[in-house]
Amino acid sequence: MNIAIAGASGRMGRMLIEQVLNTEGVSLAGALDVPGSPALGQDAGLLLGRQTGVAISSDVEAVLAGADCLIDFTRPEGTLAHVAAAKKLGVKMVIGTTGFDEAGKAALAEAARSIGIVFAANFSVGVNATFKLLEVAARLLSTGYDIEVIEAHHRFKVDAPSGTALKMGEVIADALGRDLKTCAVYAREGHTGERNPNSIGFATVRGGDIVGDHTVMFAGIGERIEISHKSSSRQSYADGAVRAARFLADKPNGLFDMQDVLGLK
């Protein structure tokens, strides 16, 4: 399988390139970056100390021309432009970008009628196992427990709460038969009154180089259960993303998530 990487000069992009180079059965077909990036024209492996023979380019269609799949962990506006080009050229996509609004998510669903797309809040196998644990815990602790989601990321993350935190909230809300749009509480300040027992709270921390910490607290009277996942590097995300690309090899179209890739549905 020939894989192209978007955001090739970024932290996640470099790790994805390295993962592709180290994975049997796949090859690096292209490396994409934004116009004006100082990395344009450089070998995609330069920052890894390796030569790939693939130059970083800002020409989306040229990069996709030799690719079977594009892996994209960038920003919503860039990803949506890449989706349009991928749909035109019949190139599949693995999307780890977070922060989409409802219109953006609808655009991904529409594109998935024509091409295979894996769109997930988190590509870590451990995080996806955590989603299943939360589903079970929410059903067992459906009454008498207050639910709070606490997440922490590095200072450069631009969206909050994280896509993973929101997915955790969705998993819990679905297990409880609730709608996260109506039961989520994203901020508390001043005189808030008593906590609504049916709400799901979110707290966000941003600082330093935290890769990603997520904890869900089920707080009852006399006890508290906490389910946590902490990432020490982005390696698990890169591994999962390449695994997702290979999953798409025989999928002509459709919208999938990491639970599909791992056979957890």
UniProtKB/Swiss-Prot annotation:
Keyword presence, NADP: yes
InterPro entries tied to this protein: DapB_C, DapB_N, DapB_N_CS, DHDPR_bac, NAD(P)-bd_dom_sf
Localization of this protein: Cytoplasm
A Gene Ontology biological process term: diaminopimelate biosynthetic process
Reaction(s) the record says it catalyses: (S)-2,3,4,5-tetrahydrodipicolinate + NAD(+) + H2O = (2S,4S)-4-hydroxy-2,3,4,5-tetrahydrodipicolinate + NADH + H(+); (S)-2,3,4,5-tetrahydrodipicolinate + NADP(+) + H2O = (2S,4S)-4-hydroxy-2,3,4,5-tetrahydrodipicolinate + NADPH + H(+)
Function recorded in the entry: Catalyzes the conversion of 4-hydroxy-tetrahydrodipicolinate (HTPA) to tetrahydrodipicolinate.
Protein name: 4-hydroxy-tetrahydrodipicolinate reductase
